[in-house]
Amino acid sequence: MRKFAAIFVVFFVQCTHLYSLAQARAEPDPGVVEYLKQSCVYGNSSYINVYLYNSRFQGKNLGNQQSCQDINASLPVVFITHGFTSSAQVSTFKDLANAFVQKGHTAFIVDWSEAACTDGLPGVQFAEYNAAASNTYDIGQLMAKYTVDLMNKCKIPLNNIQYVGHSLGSHVCGFAAKHVKKLINKTMPYILALDPADPSFGSNKCGERICKSDAKRIVVFKTSILGIGENIIGHLLIVFDGGKSQPACSWYDVPCSHSESIVYATGMVSGRCQHLAVPWTAQQRINPIQWKFWRVFTSNIPAYPTSDTTNCVVLNTNVFKNDNTFEGEYHAFPDCARNLFKCRQQ
């Protein structure tokens, strides 16, 4: 039953927009037309609001303007972007921003909620997913321009700037990084992609999604069936607890598992939690006796490390360093590790 529920979620997100748009065209009701004009369906992606987090401000709304007098140019900077039907006001993003601030960063949360269909009518929002997905390109360009403007006006070097994106926000980061390269002919140093959205992107070519070449280092967390997993889009892929559903969430609550990637990142950034992980390639993740159709929803979970395990690693704040050369595909255990055994520090 749970597998069928998961299938329904994925297919509903990807397909229902077709019916809604067809109905809107066939029956041009004035109310529907007016709603669509104000919605993300019409590409309402002309602006972003940037919220500043540092030791002085806990979410100062800068709009799309710079505020160099409020920023310590010597500190590293992180841009955080949300995904579909989300916003900068969601507590998990605030927690992540504050975790970075506590570790000596300036954090910006990029709010593109209107283009992400956050304010859509209940029951209609999922039908607008593809519109939000299409808007990621324009939002990425706006984020890139803001980044370059920050560099020029506030004298912050690109090597001190990182991108973090969740779900569709991961692709926003990818498009932003591509545009930064076009604008200044330099490559972003680091992107953290938190369960990057698979629907509308998973099978795309490199130029139409976040891609390994967008930054010198890309780290990917996978926590749900909504996230890209088999297509290696980063230098380091960390799959938490099989990458389908997470222990803190009900089996049917796919959005919860999707958002747990933010929670894991926050715990690691803050230093409150470190995870043990073992190598886990695509071949190891798939049970050869399973039907191909079910492979999307099931995995071979490896055994938890013991005192005899030598081929394991410790995932901690080092994962977020630009110069960390640790690469590969790993299965991460969701609980905070109390005993590190013989696992290597990364």
From Swiss-Prot:
It is found in: Secreted. One of its GO terms (biological process) is lipid catabolic process. The keyword Secreted applies. The active site is at S167 (nucleophile), D195 (charge relay system), H258 (charge relay system). Expressed by the venom gland. It comes from the Eukaryota. Keywords: Allergen, Cytolysis, Disulfide bond, Glycoprotein, Hemolysis, Hydrolase, Lipid degradation, Lipid metabolism, Secreted, Signal. Glycans are attached at N44, N72, N185. Residues 1-26 form the signal peptide. It catalyses: a 1,2-diacyl-sn-glycero-3-phosphocholine + H2O = a 2-acyl-sn-glycero-3-phosphocholine + a fatty acid + H(+). Its EC number is 3.1.1.32. The keyword Signal applies. GO terms for molecular function: phospholipase A1 activity; serine hydrolase activity. One of its GO terms (cellular component) is extracellular space. It holds the Pfam family Lipase. InterPro entries: AB_hydrolase_fold (IPR029058), Lipase (IPR013818), TAG_lipase (IPR000734). Catalyzes the hydrolysis of phosphatidylcholine with phospholipase A1 activity. Induces hemolytic activity. Acts as an allergen. Belongs to the AB hydrolase superfamily. Lipase family. This is Phospholipase A1.
